[in-house]
């Protein structure tokens, strides 16, 4: 198979989320992992940083199954933030920076970098994340 992408181009870019005013993700946001399909929508994790301090935290977004450019819900508070010493102290302090997630038997495994020094894995129950998002957490 030919893997030459020389003549390919991005056809359309759509902004899905951005920083929010006066929140934990007010300075910048970025994707943390590919979205995972659930019965309620695509679950997407992202990292965010506030303007008041340089702490990297993790939020969740639920996207429409048929049109993943539509945000159905977004976590008001971070679902994961630096707590352990190895997340708070390292090359860059106060960082949890997810790069992937896997769902297995109802548990979400979030693989992340901690303080740019270690690689870790955190777990959360999928139904708890989805319930929180579906219960009206702000967009």
Task: Identify the residue ranges that each predicted region occupies.
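Beta-rich carbohydrate-recognition and catalytic domains
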Residues: 1-27, 36-91, 105-108, 112-139
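Beta-propeller and closely related beta-sheet repeat lectin domains
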Residues: 31-34, 97-100
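Short, flexible loop/turn motifs enriched in small residues
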Residues: 94
């Amino acid at each position: 198979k030919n893997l030459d992408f020389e003549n390919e181009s991005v056809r359309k870019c759509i902004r899905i989320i951005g920083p929010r005013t006066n929140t934990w993700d007010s300075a910048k946001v970025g994707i943390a992992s590919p979205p995972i399909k659930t019965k309620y929508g695509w679950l997407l994790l992202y990292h965010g940083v506030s303007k008041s301090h340089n702490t990297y935290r993790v939020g969740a977004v639920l996207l429409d199954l048929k049109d993943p450019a539509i945000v159905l819900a977004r976590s008001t508070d971070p679902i994961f933030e630096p707590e352990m010493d190895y997340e708070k102290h390292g090359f860059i302090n106060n960082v949890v920076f997810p790069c992937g997630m896997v769902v297995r038997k109802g548990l979400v495994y979030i693989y992340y970098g901690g303080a740019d020094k270690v690689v870790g894995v955190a777990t959360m129950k999928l139904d708890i994340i989805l319930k929180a998002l579906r219960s009206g957490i702000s967009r």
